[in-house]
């Protein structure tokens, strides 16, 4: 009897350990099967306010409608409302959101203008600052290359003009001097013709 009691006591504690190990496995699998299918609520709220573009601010109901249409939040409306209220309250306390009207999770909400205005110029200034000096350097390089090319033909043109002006008076002066020298030579020719005419007339008179 004592041996059977010892065997029964040894077998009984082993069974619950195996059951406890099997029961622990499904809890780990359940945690892994719950991935978040949407961004954080504060990001969804900011996107909803930007897209709604209401000057007075977006209401909680309008934000909830936008979020449920554009994100996969599930079918549990009570849980979605609870998360949305918490996110709105935290956004106001952390100054990520501005409450334009109402109190708590009720009322209208906006995105701070300073944060939105600071992000847009910062993204716009960086490419503009990089592009402007490059364009200015190219323009100055082109101007420097073009200026000497334009100056060279001007110097050549002025040189040609000086040569032409110097040559033109020399050509006019030479023929004028030659014409003046030839005119007295032609006048001297008739004097030589008059002398032989007088000699021929004297000879026949001597023979008679």
From Swiss-Prot:
It comes from the Eukaryota. The keyword DNA-binding applies. GO terms for biological process: chromatin remodeling; chromosome condensation; defense response to Gram-positive bacterium; negative regulation of DNA recombination; negative regulation of gene expression; nucleosome assembly. Residues 144-155, 162-202 have a biased composition (Basic residues). Residues 101-208 are annotated as: Disordered. CDD domains: H15. The modification N-acetylserine is found at residue 2. Residues 37-113 form the H15 domain. GO terms for cellular component: chromosome, telomeric region; cytoplasm; nucleosome; nucleus. Histones H1 are necessary for the condensation of nucleosome chains into higher-order structures. Probably does not act as global transcriptional repressor. Acting in concert with chromobox protein homologs hpl-1 and hpl-2, involved in reproduction, somatic gonad development, male tail development, and vulval cell fate decisions; perhaps as a result of modulating expression of Hox genes mab-5 and egl-5. Plays a role in linking epigenetic regulation with the innate immune response. Belongs to the histone H1/H5 family. This is Histone 24. It comes from Caenorhabditis elegans. The gene is his-24.
């Amino acid at each position: 009897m004592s041996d059977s009691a010892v065997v029964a006591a040894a077998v009984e504690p082993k069974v619950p350990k195996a059951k406890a190990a099997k029961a622990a496995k499904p809890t780990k699998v359940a945690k892994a099967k719950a991935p978040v299918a949407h961004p954080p609520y504060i990001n969804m709220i900011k996107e909803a306010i930007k897209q709604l573009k209401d000057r007075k601010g977006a209401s909680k109901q309008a934000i909830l409608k936008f979020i449920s249409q554009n994100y996969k939040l599930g079918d549990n409306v009570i849980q979605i409302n609870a998360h949305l209220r918490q996110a709105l309250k935290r956004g106001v306390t952390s100054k990520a959101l501005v409450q334009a009207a109402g109190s708590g999770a009720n009322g209208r909400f906006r995105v701070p203008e300073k944060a939105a205005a600071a992000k847009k110029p910062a993204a716009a200034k960086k490419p503009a600052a990089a592009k402007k000096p490059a364009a200015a350097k190219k323009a100055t390089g082109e101007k420097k290359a073009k200026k000497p090319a334009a100056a060279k033909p001007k110097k050549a043109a002025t040189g040609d003009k000086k040569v032409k002006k110097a040559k033109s008076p020399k050509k006019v002066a030479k023929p004028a001097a030659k014409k003046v020298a030839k005119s007295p030579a032609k006048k001297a020719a008739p004097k030589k013709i008059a002398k032989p005419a007088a000699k021929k007339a004297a000879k026949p008179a001597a023979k008679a």
